[in-house]
Amino acid sequence: SCFTIGELGFGLGLNFLTTLHCWLKKERAFNLDYIGIDKKVLQKRNLRLLEERFPKLHKEIEILKECDVVGHNGFECISMPNLKIRLILITEDIQKAVNDICISNIDAWFLDGFDPKKNPEMWTDDILKAVFNLSSSDSSFSTFTSVGRIRRALSENGFEIKKVSGFGSKRHRLIGKKSKEKKKSHDIKRVAVIGTGLSGSNIAYNLANSNIKVDIFDAHDDLSKGSSGGPIASMYPKFSLNNDLRSKFLISSYFFSLNFYKKTLGFKNTGLLFYGSDDAKSKWISKISA
């Protein structure tokens, strides 16, 4: 029910936008997860450069512009539930990024297409082993390069290689797939969710959106009758003076939630005003705004 693409070298997102262009033309019977890895932060203002060069991608670029992309090191998950897409951006050194991914079901790879001499860290044995281990049993890959040592390295790390015609002035490129192994099925068919508050409702929604049958149980006769049933809900990030992991997690969580609720519940981000109700809070507000 979900197809996962991994890309080494996300850049400005041209491959993602092209994938999105194709995705919008098809009937979406399953979900798409797109994992993009790059050591540089995606700057939304740079998308105009792509729009000038690739005007046919205008619609897709506008979709990405509308998302609240934070742009920071680490993981960032951008949900587009109406399109059945999750874009997971990982802004880290390539070795750390692949080490931090904890799934092993990536179905297709866009491998770095630049001259391997310019990006040797993208083609080490450790990286290619990680790509193999993170791949599903039927995983495939493509790359713009066709250098002999890259062909051999991919082959030595478990991939079947094929050299095919390239694009434009490029004579050849490489495609391939993971060498066959016994396929294991871990498909979940049906899930019971107990509770219809914010957590239970969100879990049920995401499971159903993944084409999984859901049974919902609650002691009350309607949704969110417990502590989640308040008439008004506010959402805001918990700011910290330290750029530590907890702070990054809270900021990422806020923007993920903002994207999600805007696209599912018509959430209106009206803003909140904090007053310095005591000396401690006044000092905290002053430091945050400095």
Go through each PLM region and give its residues:
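S-adenosyl-L-methionine
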Residues: 49-101
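SAM cofactor-binding core of SAM-dependent methyltransferases
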Residues: 3-67
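Glycine-rich FAD pyrophosphate-binding loop
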Residues: 209-229
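N-terminal Rossmann-like FAD-binding beta1-loop-alpha1 element of flavoenzymes
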Residues: 188-215
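Dinucleotide-binding Rossmann-like beta1-alpha1 core, especially the glycine-rich loop
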Residues: 232-290
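A short glycine-rich, Lys/Arg-flanked "PGG" loop and its adjoining helix->strand segment in the class I
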Residues: 124-137
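Class I S-adenosyl-L-methionine
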Residues: 146-187
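Conserved beta-strand signature within the Rossmann-like core of class I S-adenosyl-L-methionine
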Residues: 138-145
